[in-house]
């Protein structure tokens, strides 16, 4: 069968890489793909972007399954477009994707359905937002309402930071947020301001087929740019799986208090949820959980280590998800740890520089031995060179018997790779070593 992966980041490279391993799959198309998918003979890049273009092409080519990686096509209604043409696709509809595309919708939904989350208020007026911050004090969290490539959240440790974030989001839109439409039909800037919750974060990702839910392996992302969780927030600088902080008790609590009430709540609101659902959880020191955010897709970079550990045929899993038969699938996992470190461009996250030539990359399927893979994200083939084309450039991911050994293997692979201004963290997985 032929499969289409929509997207061009590290998550999509990992999806295509895993799907291409299935004996049932003859070809994986990636739209638009990146420099890494271009190098792999099992994968074919397509220069298609619009939902209408993608669905027309998939119908003509008799694509057996389409899976969507990034948030933007989901928010644009790519799943609705495919289903209207009777094409099999795994992902949430445009209405369901509001859980991610609108922070205001998401917080109101959680409040309505009793899903544990931080106390919050929603503002369109800067004066009222500034007054609320002064009343609540710092630390406090300011979130842009709209898609912002994972960078529209400021964890303000001081009042000055919080006030600046409100001005950036409401007045100047410094984060380039795609604004949502309000009840009056007008698109405008909104912010969600919420209490700061301390604890340990975990990425809890499940597959949903409309009625059945299957949890993926647990993982933990590292949002800050620099070692020791310093510097600005990013789309994610590395991840590892499994996450020791998600104990069996926390796992059961997350399913019971967050995931299942979300699926049931969406259904009671007239929206059937299908696709991946990612709950960003904060596990407090006293063992409670709070939902920081929902994403309607796999996390990036969490996907890379999770899929390195998955032993089950991913094509079987996603087809069962698209056909409402997830109850027939049991996921098998490699018992080893997988850890991925992101190599980012000079100037990332605010102003990444493009065009730098990347040296020392493995060719073909991007693997290094049988225990490491260099997944591409912001890369492009220009002539015979692979160049930096985005903020997060590569994710070097390895399997090993322990976090420490996985860190060492990743560091070894990174030594062979280079581009001007390359920045990365050397402490991914540090919480598991405490």
Task: Describe these PLM feature segments.
Residues 1-94:
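ATP-binding N-terminal substructure of ATP-dependent carboxylate-amine bond-forming enzymes
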Residues 50, 379-383, 387-434:
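Generic C-terminus detector
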Residues 129, 161-164, 350-352, 401-408:
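Short, conserved charged micro-motifs
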Residues 44-50, 121-125, 156:
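Short acidic-hydrophobic, aromatic-tinged amphipathic segments that line or gate anion-handling sites
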Residues 255-277, 295-363, 367-369, 382:
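Active-site "cap" helix and flanking loop/linker of ATP-utilizing ligase/carboxylase catalytic domains
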Residues 156-303:
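Internal nucleotide-binding/catalytic subdomain
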Residues 90-152:
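A conserved helix-loop-beta module that forms one wall/lid of the active-site cleft
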């Amino acid at each position: 069968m032929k499969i289409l992966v929509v997207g061009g980041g590290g998550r999509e490279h990992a999806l295509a890489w895993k799907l291409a391993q299935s004996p049932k799959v003859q070809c994986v198309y990636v739209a638009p793909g990146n420099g890494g998918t271009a190098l792999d003979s099992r994968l074919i890049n397509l220069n298609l972007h619009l939902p209408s273009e993608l669905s027309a092409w998939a119908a003509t080519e008799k694509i057996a399954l389409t899976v969507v990686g990034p948030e933007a096509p989901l928010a644009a209604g790519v799943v609705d477009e495919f289903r209207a043409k009777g094409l099999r696709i795994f992902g949430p509809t445009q209405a369901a994707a509001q859980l991610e595309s609108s922070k205001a919708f998401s917080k109101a939904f959680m409040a309505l359905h009793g899903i544990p989350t931080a106390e919050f208020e929603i503002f369109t007026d800067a004066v009222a937002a500034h007054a609320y911050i002064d009343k609540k004090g710092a630390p406090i969290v300011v979130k842009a309402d709209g898609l912002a490539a994972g960078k529209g959240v400021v964890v303000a440790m001081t009042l000055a930071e919080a006030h600046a974030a409100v001005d950036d989001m409401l007045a100047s839109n410094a984060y380039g947020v795609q604004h949502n439409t309000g009840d009056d039909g007008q698109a405008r800037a909104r912010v969600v301001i919420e209490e700061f919750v301390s604890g340990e974060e975990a990425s809890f990702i499940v597959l949903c087929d409309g009625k059945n839910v299957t949890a993926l392996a647990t993982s933990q992302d590292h949002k800050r740019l620099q070692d020791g969780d310093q510097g600005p927030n990013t789309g994610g600088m590395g991840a590892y799986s499994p996450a020791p902080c998600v104990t069996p008790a926390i796992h059961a609590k997350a399913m019971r208090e967050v995931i299942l009430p979300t699926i049931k709540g969406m259904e009671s609101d007239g929206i059937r949820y299908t696709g991946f659902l990612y709950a960003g959880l904060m596990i407090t020191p006293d063992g409670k959980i709070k939902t920081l955010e929902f994403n309607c897709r796999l996390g990036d970079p969490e996907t890379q280590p999770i899929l390195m550990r998955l032993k089950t045929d991913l094509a079987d899993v996603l087809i069962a998800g698209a056909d409402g038969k997830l109850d027939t699938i049991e996921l098998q996992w490699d018992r080893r740890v997988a850890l991925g470190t992101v190599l980012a461009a000079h100037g990332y996250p605010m102003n990444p520089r493009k065009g730098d030539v990347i040296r020392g990359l493995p060719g073909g399927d991007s693997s290094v031995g049988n225990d490491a893979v260099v997944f591409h994200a912001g890369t492009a083939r220009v002539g015979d060179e692979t160049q930096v084309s985005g903020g997060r450039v590569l994710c070097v991911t390895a399997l090993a018997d322990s976090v420490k050994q996985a860190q060492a293997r990743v560091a070894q692979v990174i030594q062979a790779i280079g581009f001007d201004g390359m920045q990365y963290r050397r402490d991914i997985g540090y919480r598991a070593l405490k």
